[in-house]
Amino acid sequence: MESQIRQNYHHDCERAINRMINMEMFASYTYTSMAFYFSRDDVALPGFAHFFKENSEEEREHADKLLSFQNKRGGRILLQDIKKPERDEWGNGLEAMQCALQLEKNVNQALLDLHKIASDKVDPHLCDFLETHYLNEQVEAIKKLGDHITNLTKMDAVKNKMAEYLFDKHTLGGQS
C-alpha cells in the first residue's frame, strides 16, 4: 500500500536509502568489532577501543536518522542482512585506522552516489538532508583518520609499541 504522505519521493531514492541504512549498519558493526578487539586483554589499548566504540555509535545514529527520514517521506523500510566485517583481528592501531579510513571513504562514496540519485530525481528534500547531516561530517571523519594515520606513521608505531601506547593514552585518551 502506497503511503498517503509520499510526495516527490522517487522509488530509486527509497531503494538507495535502504541500501545506505545497511551500509551505515555495516560500518557500525565493523567499528564494534574493532572496539572490542582493542579492549581484549592481549591487546589492551583502551583509547583505540573507546575511539572505535564512539565511531560505532555514530554510524548507528546515522542509520537511525535514515530510518526516520524514510518514514517521514512515506518510504518503506526494507532491512537487509548486515554483512560480517571483513576481519576478526585488526592487528595494530595503524592497521585498524587504515581499515577505518577505507570504510569511511566507502561510506562517503555511497553518500555521494545517493546525493546524485536525489539530484537526478529532483528531490531537494533528500539533497538538503544529506548535505545537512552527512556530507561534511564524512569529510571531517576522513580528515581525522588521516591525521591519526599520519601521526602513527611518523611515530613508527608499527615497530615501536611504546609509541602506539603513548598515542593510545595521550591522543585517544586511553586510561590504563
Swiss-Prot record:
Quaternary structure and partners: Oligomer of 24 subunits. There are at least two types of subunits. The functional molecule forms a roughly spherical shell with a diameter of 12 nm and contains a central cavity into which the insoluble mineral iron core is deposited.
Pfam families hit by this protein: Ferritin
GO molecular-function terms, A-Z: ferric iron binding; ferrous iron binding; ferroxidase activity
GO BP field: intracellular iron ion homeostasis; iron ion transport
Binding-site residues, Fe cation 2: 59, 104, 138
Family from the record: Belongs to the ferritin family.
Top EC class for this record: oxidoreductase
Known EC number: 1.16.3.1
The entry's keywords: Iron, Iron storage, Metal-binding, Oxidoreductase
Ferritin-like diiron domain ranges (all copies): 7-156
Organs and tissues of expression: Almost exclusively in the gonads.
Function text: Stores iron in a soluble, non-toxic, readily available form. Important for iron homeostasis. Has ferroxidase activity. Iron is taken up in the ferrous form and deposited as ferric hydroxides after oxidation.
Gene Ontology cellular component annotations, sorted alphabetically: cytoplasm
Reactions mediated catalytically: 4 Fe(2+) + O2 + 4 H(+) = 4 Fe(3+) + 2 H2O
Protein name (record): Ferritin, middle subunit
Chain residues that bind Fe cation 1: 24, 59, 62
Source superkingdom: Eukaryota
InterPro entries: Ferritin, Ferritin-like, Ferritin-like_diiron, Ferritin-like_SF, Ferritin_CS, Ferritin_DPS_dom
Signal sequence extent: none
